[in-house]
């Protein structure tokens, strides 16, 4: 990675404005999944050990530019204190006199959590005045919020106009892993693309066709490809306006020598429920009033075999409606194949794929789980991320 990280700068006694991603799911004031808080710990601990004054900023939910009581970061600050085993202070604003006073009172190694940055309308507009206010609190800007790196906001990008800007350890690792996958992959390199909609994955498929040896397609978006081949798909998800594009992608794969894998059999159902009756049929045998909801057992075997023989696998998007037990087996099988594969480096591209490997208890068997759904998707599309571009070069 050619961007400076916290390892490249002197931090002792410095006030560090560290943008983290503490956008955790909450229920009735309780944190239901603290993965993102834990992911930021190595950076925070490093800053503390180096004698920095650690000022943490994050968004939580979508308060739309005003203070929303249940979206305050107070419970997050409390939990962070427990995880760090030290006192963590919490400011009720993200800039201004109160925040400035609290920062002025900090000693080396102290940790302060600012209020939800999205309580201010200027945050999502990348307002220069707000960015200046944030910058006034600190000597150095650290961006460790990979999950928000695709956003050009005041606390993720704008602030870098006014302070030296470096990455945190989590951001550094994300950029290293994803960057190596796209620029210098070990081969065979396989991408598994799933999820509901072709339109969400157009950029990724287009970009990866130039990079991969194998492209595996699953999830709801597969049926647009199946229909493009002339098969009947019943009531399965389909984007008719993307059929020509699907044909184009399959043709491109052929021209570029990429092995293009699609389901050969599918799980079908007449109703969406936990107790649904399902059948397994060949891809050319979906009845008119049934819909495909998962990849079938033959497909799972083929996909598992490709995974086993790959050196690098990037997975973005589930194979079926994994949230419901009867339609979860395909996604589980892909996860299991990755967990069992020896000598295969597995990169899980955030979002639903990350949720799936968590749900099936396979997370610790994956080489790297990205903390950014949208950000990793845009990175894999070959786009520049504003929260990365703004960092100082080495």
Curated annotation (Swiss-Prot):
InterPro entries to which the protein is assigned, alphabetical: Phosphoglycerate_kinase, Phosphoglycerate_kinase_CS, Phosphoglycerate_kinase_N, Phosphoglycerate_kinase_sf
Q: Which Gene3D superfamilies match?
A: Phosphoglycerate kinase, N-terminal domain (3.40.50.1260)
EC number of this enzyme: 2.7.2.3
Q: Where is the signal peptide?
A: none
Q: Where ATP is bound, by residue?
A: 201, 292, 323, 350-353
Question: Which Gene Ontology molecular-function terms are recorded?
Answer: ADP binding; ATP binding; phosphoglycerate kinase activity
Q: Which pathway, metabolic or otherwise, does it act in?
A: Carbohydrate degradation; glycolysis; pyruvate from D-glyceraldehyde 3-phosphate: step 2/5
- Which residues are modified to Phosphothreonine? 299
Q: Which Pfam families match?
A: PGK
State the compartments where it is located. Answer: Cytoplasm
In this UniProt entry, the residues modified to Phosphoserine are 183
Q: Which GO terms describe its cellular component?
A: cytosol
Q: What is its main location?
A: cytoplasm
UniProt keyword annotations, A-Z: ATP-binding, Cytoplasm, Glycolysis, Kinase, Nucleotide-binding, Phosphoprotein, Transferase
As its record notes, the protein acts as a catalyst of: (2R)-3-phosphoglycerate + ATP = (2R)-3-phospho-glyceroyl phosphate + ADP
Q: Which CDD domains match?
A: Phosphoglycerate_kinase
Where does the source fall among the domains of life? Answer: Bacteria
Name its GO BP terms in alphabetical order.
Answer: gluconeogenesis; glycolytic process
Where substrate binds, per the record, is at 21-23, 36, 59-62, 118, 151
Q: Note the PANTHER family from the entry.
A: PHOSPHOGLYCERATE KINASE (PTHR11406), PHOSPHOGLYCERATE KINASE 1, CHLOROPLASTIC-RELATED (PTHR11406:SF23)
HAMAP family with a match to the protein in the record: Phosphoglyc_kinase
Q: Could you describe the subunit structure of this protein?
A: Monomer.
The similarity comment for this entry is:
Belongs to the phosphoglycerate kinase family.
Name this protein carries in UniProt: Phosphoglycerate kinase
């Amino acid at each position: 990675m050619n961007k400076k990280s916290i390892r490249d700068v002197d931090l002792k006694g410095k006030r560090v404005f560290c943008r983290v991603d503490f956008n955790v799911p909450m229920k009735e004031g309780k944190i239901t999944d603290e993965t993102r808080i834990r992911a930021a710990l190595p950076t925070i601990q490093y800053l503390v050990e180096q004698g920095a004054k650690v000022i943490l900023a994050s968004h939580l939910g979508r308060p739309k530019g005003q203070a929303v009581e249940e979206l305050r970061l107070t419970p997050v600050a409390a939990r962070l204190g427990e995880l760090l085993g030290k006192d963590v202070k919490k400011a009720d604003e993200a800039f201004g006199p109160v925040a400035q006073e609290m920062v002025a009172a900090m000693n080396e190694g102290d940790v302060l959590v600012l209020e939800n940055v999205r309580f201010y309308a200027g945050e999502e507009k990348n307002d220069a005045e707000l960015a200046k206010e944030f910058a006034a609190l600190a000597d150095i800007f650290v961006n460790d919020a990979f999950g928000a790196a695709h956003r050009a906001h005041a606390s993720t990008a704008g602030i870098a106009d006014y302070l030296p800007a470096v990455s945190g350890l989590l951001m550094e690792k994300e950029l290293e892993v994803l960057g190596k996958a796209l620029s210098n992959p070990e081969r065979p390199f396989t991408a598994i693309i799933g999820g509901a909609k072709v339109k969400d994955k157009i950029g990724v498929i287009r970009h990866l066709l130039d990079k991969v040896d194998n492209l595996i397609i699953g999830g709801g978006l597969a049926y647009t490809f199946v229909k493009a081949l002339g098969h009947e798909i019943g009531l399965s998800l389909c984007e008719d306006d993307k059929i020509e594009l699907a044909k184009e992608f399959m043709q491109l794969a052929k021209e570029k020598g990429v092995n293009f894998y699609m389901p050969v059999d599918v799980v079908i159902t007449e109703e969406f429920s936990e107790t649904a009756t399902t059948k397994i049929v060949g891809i050319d045998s979906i009845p008119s009033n049934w819909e495909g909801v998962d990849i079938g057992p033959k497909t799972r075997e083929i996909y598992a075999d490709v995974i086993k023989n790959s050196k690098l696998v990037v997975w973005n998007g589930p194979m079926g409606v994994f949230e419901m037990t009867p339609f979860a087996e395909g996604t589980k099988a892909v996860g299991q194949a990755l967990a069992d594969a020896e000598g295969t480096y597995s990169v899980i591209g955030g979002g639903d794929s990350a949720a799936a490997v968590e749900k099936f208890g396979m997370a610790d068997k994956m080489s790297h789980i990205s903390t950014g759904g949208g950000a990793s998707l845009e990175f894999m599309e070959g786009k520049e991320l504003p929260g990365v571009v703004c960092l100082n070069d080495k």
